[in-house]
Amino acid sequence: MAPKFPDSVEELRAAGNESFRNGQYAEASALYGRALRVLQAQGSSDPEEESVLYSNRAACHLKDGNCRDCIKDCTSALALVPFSIKPLLRRASAYEALEKYPMAYVDYKTVLQIDDNVTSAVEGINRMTRALMDSLGPEWRLKLPSIPLVPVSAQKRWNSLPSENHKEMAKSKSKETTATKNRVPSAGDVEKARVLKEEGNELVKKGNHKKAIEKYSESLLCSNLESATYSNRALCYLVLKQYTEAVKDCTEALKLDGKNVKAFYRRAQAHKALKDYKSSFADISNLLQIEPRNGPAQKLRQEVKQNLH
C-alpha cells in the first residue's frame, strides 16, 4: 500500500519542515505552497498560520538564492502579522544579498526595536552601517527610508512566545562578533573613527545624547580601540538612564585603558543607580587610587557609603 500523501495544512507544513531540515529546499517550498493553497481554499481566517507558511517558504527561497521571491513572501507574511521577527530577518538578508542596503538596514533596525538581543540583527546593522557609510557618505542616515515605529503590542507578542523562539535567534548583544573584535583597523578607519567621535562630542555639547550614541557607535564600528569613545557613549547612556548599557561601555573602556578615570566614575554612577553599591564603592576606590583628590569622586563615595550601611 502506497504511503498516504499529506493533505492537511498541518501535515503539509510538517512535511515541508522535514524537507527543509534535510536540505531539500525546492521540495519544502512546494509543500509550503500546497499548504497555503489548502488553507486559503478553506476560507477560514488564520493569519498566524498563513504568515508562518509564507515566512517558511521565504526561507526556502533565501536558501536557493531566490531573493526576490523571498522578499515577496516575507512581505506577504508581514502583511498578515506585522512586526514578525523571522520574516523581517529573512527579508533583511535578501535585501542585503541584492545590495539594497537602506532597505536591509530598516528591517534589521525594526527587529532591534522588538528585541535588541537578536544577534543576527545586531550584526546586520553593523554591516549595513559600514556599507552605507562607504556608499552614501557621512549623511547616509538622511537618505534612509522611514523606519516604522514598533507598537508595544508587537513587543509583548514576541516576549510572550515560547523561549525556544528566543533561544533560536537571541544571544547577548553585548558580545560583538569575533570578526569585528579581531579586525585590525586601517589608518583610514582610525581617522574616520576620530571624526565620528568628534561629531558625537559636539552633539553631547548640544544635549543631543541619542544622536551622539549613534555617532559613537559608528565610530566604534570603524575602530573599537579607543577607550574614550566607550566612556563618552557611557555618559550618554547615563543621561538617558540606560544604566546597564553604561556599565558595559565603561567596562570596555577600562579593558582598553585601566586608568580611565571617567570610565571608573561613570561606572560607579551607573552601579549606584542600579543599587549595586558594593560595585560602585569599588569603582570609586579604584578611581581615588589614581586621583586621590578627585572632588566629585570623594562626594560620590560619601553618598554610596551611606547606602552601604
Swiss-Prot record:
* Molecular function as annotated in GO: heat shock protein binding
- Recorded topology in the membrane: Peripheral membrane protein
What tissues express this gene product? Ubiquitous.
Glycyl lysine isopeptide (Lys-Gly) (interchain with G-Cter in SUMO2) cross-link: located at 197
Q: Which InterPro entries does this entry report, sorted A to Z?
A: CiliaryAsmbly_MitoImport, TPR-like_helical_dom_sf, TPR_rpt
Major location category of this protein: cytoplasm
Where does each TPR repeat begin and end? 9-42, 51-84, 86-118, 193-226, 227-260, 262-294
Where are the stretches annotated Disordered?
161-189
* Keywords annotated in UniProt: Chaperone, Cytoplasm, Isopeptide bond, Membrane, Mitochondrion, Mitochondrion outer membrane, Phosphoprotein, Repeat, TPR repeat, Ubl conjugation
Query: Which Gene Ontology cellular component terms are annotated?
Result: cytosol; intracellular membrane-bounded organelle; membrane; mitochondrial outer membrane; mitochondrion; nucleus
Localization per record: Cytoplasm; Mitochondrion outer membrane
For this chain's UniProt record, which GO biological process terms are given? protein targeting to mitochondrion
Phosphoserine-modified residues are 8, 160, 186
Per the record, the domain of life is Eukaryota
- Regions of biased composition (Basic and acidic residues) lie at 164-178
Known SMART domains for this protein?
TPR
Q: Per its database record, what is this protein's job?
A: Plays a role in the import of cytosolically synthesized preproteins into mitochondria. Binds the mature portion of precursor proteins. Interacts with cellular components, and possesses weak ATPase activity. May be a chaperone-like protein that helps to keep newly synthesized precursors in an unfolded import compatible state.
Complex and partners: Interacts with HSP90A, VCP, ATP6V1D, KIAA0665, AMPK, and DMAP1 through its TPR repeat.
So what family is this one in?
A: Belongs to the Tom34 family.
Name-wise, this protein is: Mitochondrial import receptor subunit TOM34
Q: Which organism is it from?
A: Homo sapiens
